[in-house]
Regions:
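Sec-dependent bacterial lipoprotein signal peptides
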Residues: 1-15
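Acidic, low-complexity intrinsically disordered segments
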Residues: 17-169
């Protein structure tokens, strides 16, 4: 009888438990080809300067990008944007960054090494340094107005444009 009661109580406890649902919307959950942030969430100290990578995920034949990255200027100040290794060949990529107040525009172009005219694969496109101005949550978003082109200036289809959550305390 004791075994039956214990089994019954265990069964009731099993039914009463809820299975937690987690949001694992990270780099490898993106549907490639994609432009995503790595990591997608960062806890920071308010007033500090931090960095995040904007990465290409399985993009083939890329010769250039226009990236529109939106942010809230009440919470975030963009300090610096530096080209990553994705477009690097024997020549460093050409990157132009324009801050428009609520978004930045990043133009980055692959400079041919005489052998290939484009970059392929995954890697850091740019590293973004930002200052969290005050406590609270904010985001950096890659707008769907962003474009990726091949060597013939033909648009490449992107399946995912990522976001980055800043949790400043």
């Amino acid at each position: 009888m004791k075994k039956i009661i214990i089994s019954f109580l265990c069964f009731i406890m099993f039914l009463a438990c809820e299975v937690p649902e987690y949001d694992f919307n990270e780099f490898y959950d993106a549907d490639p080809p994609a432009l995503v942030f790595q990591p997608f969430l960062k806890k920071v100290v308010a007033g500090s300067v931090n960095r995040v990578d904007l990465e290409a995920l399985e993009i083939n034949g890329t010769a250039g990008m226009y990236i529109k990255m939106e942010y809230d200027p009440d919470f975030v100040a963009i300090k610096e944007v530096v080209a990553g290794e994705f477009f690097a060949s024997t020549n460093q990529p050409m990157a132009i960054v324009e801050d428009q107040g609520t978004y930045i525009e990043i133009y980055i172009v692959y400079l041919s090494d005489g052998i290939s005219q484009s970059a392929t694969g995954s890697g850091v496109v740019v590293e973004v340094a930002f200052e969290s101005l005050k406590a609270g949550k904010s985001q950096l978003n890659i707008s769907d107005q962003s474009k990726v082109v091949d060597a013939n200036n033909e648009g490449l289809v992107m399946n995912t444009f990522g976001y980055f959550i800043i949790d400043a305390r």
